[in-house]
Amino acid sequence: MSSELPPLEQAKRIAAHQAVEQHYPKDAKVVGIGSGSTVVYVAEKIASLPKELTKDTVFISTGFQSKQLIQNAGLRLGCIDQYSNGDLDVAFDGADETDPQLNCIKGGGACLFQEKIVAECARKFVVVADYRKQSKALGTVWIQGIPIEVVPDAYNKVIADLKKMGAQSAVLRPGSPGKAGPIITDNGNFIVDAYFGEIQPDAVKDLHIKIKLLLGVVETGLFTNADVAYFGNADGTISTITK
């Protein structure tokens, strides 16, 4: 581990490296690489593996950032549209928040639709993050709201529907500084961030279904299918949650 990294980055790195060490198959054929600051270290670790473990492996990205990570690491890039449920050996991805039952909020980087496709197609979904992303209930740490990808023509209706459902706030996510208008996803859609307060672990799946059924919603940032999560701690240890 590099002592030059700030403590938070060291925490991310140890979690990512251990996750790869314990879950990257020796005979991997297709592997998903997600988005976010911790996944940088997933790509770093995979790139350091013996070439015989990666030379025949196809790596699937969840967006522009992870595509660059794969290419910069000299790994073989594939497209998710060639694969279906169970075709990926494993997928590694970050999370904005994770509860004790491995429910996650994802989509802070606006790649939630692609992230969910990759996660759904993987036989094992591994979450990597730092200690700040672990909580007793979703909405405790990540208070920006559940990211929801929405068809542009329906965003006002979806916001109104979310508030009727009980969202304390529901707002259209603005673009980055210097960009006029809202953020646009890789699919040409908008992101609405809806905050429902603390969501008890047993209520996450039901809330996801209710939001997903709203006309105009493409996908929600509620993930309920993780198999294991690794959290790098400030003291250099790693905490894990498994099913």
Swiss-Prot record:
It is an enzyme of class 5 (isomerase). It is found in: Cytoplasm. One of its GO terms (biological process) is D-ribose metabolic process. Pathway: Carbohydrate degradation; pentose phosphate pathway; D-ribose 5-phosphate from D-ribulose 5-phosphate (non-oxidative stage): step 1/1. It comes from the Eukaryota. Its EC number is 5.3.1.6. One of its GO terms (cellular component) is cytoplasm. The keyword Lipid biosynthesis does not apply. Keywords: Cytoplasm, Isomerase. Pfam families: Rib_5-P_isom_A. CDD domains: RPI_A. Its main location: cytoplasm. InterPro entries: NagB/RpiA_transferase-like, Ribose5P_isomerase_type_A. One of its GO terms (molecular function) is ribose-5-phosphate isomerase activity. The keyword Cytoplasm applies. It catalyses: aldehydo-D-ribose 5-phosphate = D-ribulose 5-phosphate. Belongs to the ribose 5-phosphate isomerase family. This is Ribose-5-phosphate isomerase. It comes from Yarrowia lipolytica (strain CLIB 122 / E 150) (Yeast). The gene is RKI1.
